[in-house]
């Protein structure tokens, strides 16, 4: 039996599962477009305000700091997952795993100190920071 035929025979279950998932997604999307409401009007394009008349604009400018905090959260959260995976297998990894985890934590702390030093974690405007620095001197 050629190798490609053996590979196909080995993975036929996964192929059927994949086809089933794609078919189910297509079925649900098609059914929702058929059964869903198709009303178009002025009130459909307004933001929902819990039954009250909307006040102001729905478009708000957010500071880039919010996105920075979100990225930092995701980065440090993934790093915490790596440390959790290490803590589960700490007995099997021995001292070499412990030293590797310490190096990993040191790299994390170095990154955090760098972000702190360049001001990525400062929320105060530049003028306020300068005034506070002058007051400390």
Curated annotation (Swiss-Prot):
It is found in: Cell inner membrane. It catalyses: a quinone + NADH + 5 H(+)(in) = a quinol + NAD(+) + 4 H(+)(out). Signal peptide: none annotated. The chain crosses the membrane at residues 12-32, 66-86, 95-115. It is a multi-pass membrane protein. InterPro entries: NAD(P)H_OxRDtase_bac/plastid (IPR023043), NADH_UbQ/plastoQ_OxRdtase_su3 (IPR000440), NDAH_ubi_oxred_su3_sf (IPR038430). NDH-1 is composed of 13 different subunits. Subunits NuoA, H, J, K, L, M, N constitute the membrane sector of the complex. Belongs to the complex I subunit 3 family. This is NADH-quinone oxidoreductase subunit A. It comes from Pseudomonas syringae pv. tomato (strain ATCC BAA-871 / DC3000).
């Amino acid at each position: 039996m050629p190798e490609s035929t053996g590979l196909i025979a080995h993975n036929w279950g996964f192929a059927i599962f994949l086809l089933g998932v794609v078919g189910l997604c297509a079925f649900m999307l098609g059914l929702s477009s058929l059964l869903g409401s198709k009303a178009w009007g002025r009130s459909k394009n307004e933001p929902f305000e819990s039954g009250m008349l909307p006040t102001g604009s729905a478009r708000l400018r957010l500071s880039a700091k919010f996105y920075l905090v979100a990225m930092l959260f995701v980065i440090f959260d993934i790093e915490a997952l790596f440390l959790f995976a290490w803590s589960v297998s700490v007995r099997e990894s021995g001292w070499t795993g412990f030293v590797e985890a310490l190096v990993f934590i040191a790299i994390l702390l170095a990154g955090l100190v760098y972000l702190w030093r360049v001001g990525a974690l400062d929320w105060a405007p530049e003028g306020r920071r300068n005034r506070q620095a002058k007051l400390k001197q």
